[in-house]
Regions:
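Transmembrane helices of ABC transporter permease
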Residues: 13, 17-30, 34, 133-188, ...
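An intracellular "coupling" helix at the cytosolic face of ABC transporter transmembrane type-1 domains
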Residues: 8, 13, 105-106, 122-131, ...
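Short intracellular "coupling" helices and adjacent cytoplasmic loop segments at the cytosolic face
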Residues: 80, 86, 94-118, 122-126, ...
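Alpha-helical segments in transporter systems
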Residues: 16-37, 59, 63, 80-82, ...
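Transmembrane helix-loop-helix hairpins at lipid-water interfaces of multipass membrane proteins
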Residues: 18-76, 80, 154-161, 271-274
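ABC-type nucleotide-binding domain
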Residues: 330-618
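A short amphipathic helical element positioned immediately N-terminal to and/or at the very start
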Residues: 1-15, 116
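Helix-loop-helix
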Residues: 50-58, 151-169, 236, 240-309, ...
Length: 618
């Protein structure tokens, strides 16, 4: 039931609008409740012959006036309530989106995209139904029920009123019996819908792999299973909901039968008049719709509680990474990074993935990080971005602990290219200028030239205004990576981090991009904001880091070697072995098993690699 606080806060915030809307809807129902009584008076007048033409015209005019006012107030009240219901829909989706932006990657490892889509679409719509249609029907039905019961008891006969409304006392028992079952089944239906959305997202996102493997029949079968699950859960919900919806009118019909029987007896006994009997019969008939509305409202409430609880559970999730309280440095980053004795393990895990990592990089410098998959390179990038919090005192920027910077300030000072080079389903220009609300076209073109993708872009039908499709599906892998790097350059941040972002680029283009980036790291022409950059290049391709000022070699979460390219080759260790493997060069080993590395050999092999004759084996 905690989820109901969401609705309570919303109604309390807009209490005046809801008060006005509810008042107008209630007024419409109260006016409608007067019509049976007026018809009863007209019936008695016609029977007794006391109703002349003038009075008849008055009653007809009064009934017409009541009808007009009822329609106007009912329409106005419903519009007000529905408008605020739409506003709640907007606010809830905004809150969900903002919450997702604060959550760490570990949350997304535990929850599927489909489930989150179900929250934003299906659950929010169910809540909107509660605060718009639910409130309107509840007020209308309840006002009509109370007004009719009062008029029947006061102007007709209280005993007949009890006979007509007595069966309705069973409705609370129905709510207690079926309510929890409806609520539980609604939650299961929403979860099944989330699972189907996840399957749909995966199949569409991986449609190339599906077609390449010719497994359409397999994914269709899996999708059908998900749909069958939804149908099964929905049918269980429909059976329970329909049972509840059928039993409420049954109670109304029982009341109508009691009224006909007992009312007929009172009429023949001359306890009530014919007009009273007609009015009472009309009241009971009039109550059918509001009682069905109240039954529908109870159904909506049970479904909404399940959705509200799901939304509330998400909104209550506490982000694992937050701005620290106390000493906060809200100032721009300058570009000096130092990592000292960093050991890190993921939350909930006892195994450390990084062990005693130390290095530093300053403005105008480039640090290369290489290592096999799973060696901890990307984890380090996550820590620098504070997607996870590093231990206190292990990572500092400009001489201050990284934890002392606000998250917004920290991430504003870092331009990052992820491994997958993720692009958004918008134009090329908006992807490159993603850090600006209104991207500068000339600046975007200059960044594209630096990453050697400008020539490709101007060949597109709409050039920089070309829509690239979901995740850049209309682009090649190399084009996506180069646009992602251009996006990093466009941001013009003091720190640049590239996480294996050149894997889909050919060697000559890679060499051109890296040469431009090295120049950029030292001086970005026309940039007074950040004249020099501290650049970190993470890669398993050694050609991407060979010109870095310092290279650190990761293995099993540890730094096993460090130095520049020439120094690491002269050591003849892990880096040198990787270099020769990627260059596709083999030599006979000396008798002692050690390879003799001479400077001429190095020069020749570097030329070979630069020419692009290499074979990746990592």
């Amino acid at each position: 039931m905690r989820g109901l606080r969401i609705v309570g806060l919303h109604v309390r915030k807009h209490w005046f609008i809801y008060f006005a809307g509810i008042g107008m809807v209630a007024t419409a129902s109260l006016l409608a409740a007067q019509i049976p009584r007026l018809l009863g008076i007209v019936t008695d007048g016609l029977r007794d012959g006391t109703l002349d033409t003038a009075k008849m015209a008055q009653y007809v005019g009064l009934i017409i006036l009541i009808g007009i006012v009822r329609v106007a107030t009912g329409w106005g009240g419903r519009v007000l309530v529905h408008h605020k219901g739409r506003e709640l829909t907007y606010n809830l989706r905004k809150q969900l989106f903002e919450k997702w932006g604060t959550l760490s990657p570990s949350y997304y490892h535990r929850h599927s995209v489909g489930d989150m889509i179900s929250h934003a679409l299906s659950d929010v719509e169910v809540v909107r139904e509660l605060v718009s249609q639910g409130i309107n029907q509840a007020v209308s039905g309840l006002a009509m029920l109370l007004a009719a019961a009062w008029l029947m008891a006061v102007h007709v006969d209280w005993r007949l009123t009890l006979a007509g409304l007595g069966p309705l006392l069973l409705i609370p028992l129905l709510v207690k019996w079926l309510g929890p079952q409806i609520r539980l089944q609604s939650q299961r239906s929403q979860e099944a819908l989330g699972a189907m959305a996840q399957t749909t997202e995966e199949v569409i996102g991986g449609i190339r792999a599906v077609k390449a493997f010719g497994t359409e029949h397999i994914v269709i079968s899996r999708f059908e299973n998900k749909v069958d699950d939804i149908v099964e859960e929905k049918m269980r919900f429909v059976r329970l909901s329909s049972l509840f919806g059928a039993l409420v009118p049954l109670m109304v019909n029982l009341g109508f039968i009691f009224v006909l029987g007992y009312g007929g007896f009172l009429l023949t006994a001359k306890v009530i008049s014919l007009g009273d009997f007609v009015a009472f019969t009309l009241y009971v008939a009039l109550l059918r719709q509001p009682l069905e509305q109240l039954g529908n409202v109870l159904n909506i409430i049970q479904r909404s509680i399940a959705s509200l609880n799901r939304i509330d559970e998400l909104l209550r999730v506490v982000p694992e990474v937050l701005d620290r309280e106390g000493y906060i440095l809200d100032r721009p980053l300058q570009g000096t990074l130092k990592v000292q004795g960093l050991t890190f393990r993921y939350p909930g895990s006892e195994r450390a993935v990084l062990h005693d990592i130390s290095f530093s990089v300053g403005p105008g410098q480039t640090l290369g990080i290489i290592g096999a998959m799973g060696s901890g390179k990307s984890t380090l990038a996550d820590l620098l971005l504070r997607l996870y919090d590093p231990p206190d005192g292990t990572v500092s920027i400009d001489g201050e602990d990284i934890l002392h910077y606000p998250l917004a300030r920290l991430r504003d000072g870092i331009a990052y290219v992820p491994q997958d080079g993720f692009l958004f389903s918008t134009t090329v220009l908006e992807n490159i200028g993603f850090s600006d609300e209104y991207p500068d076209r000339k600046r975007a073109e200059r960044c594209a030239e630096i990453t050697a993708v400008h020539e490709n872009i101007i060949s597109f039908p709409e050039k920089y205004d070309t829509e690239i499709g979901e995740r850049g599906v209309r682009l090649s892998g190399g084009q996506k990576q180069r646009i992602a790097i251009a996006r990093m350059i466009y941001k013009d941040a003091p720190f640049q981090i590239m996480d294996d972002s050149l894997s889909a680029v050919d060697t000559s283009t890679e060499r051109r991009i890296l040469r431009n980036l090295l120049d950029l790291a030292r001086l970005f022409p026309g940039s007074a904001k950040n004249p020099s950059k501290a650049t970190i290049i993470i890669s398993h391709r050694l050609s991407a880091v060979q010109h870095a000022d310092e290279i650190v070699v990761f293995a099993d979460g540890r730094i096993v070697e460090r130095g520049n390219h020439t120094e690491l080759l002269s050591i003849g260790g892990h880096y040198a072995g990787l270099w020769y493997m990627q260059a596709g060069i083999t030599e006979e080993s000396d008798s002692d098993g050690q390879r003799d590395i001479s400077q001429p050999d190095l020069d020749v092999e570097m030329d070979v690699l630069e020419a692009g004759r290499m074979e990746e084996v990592l």
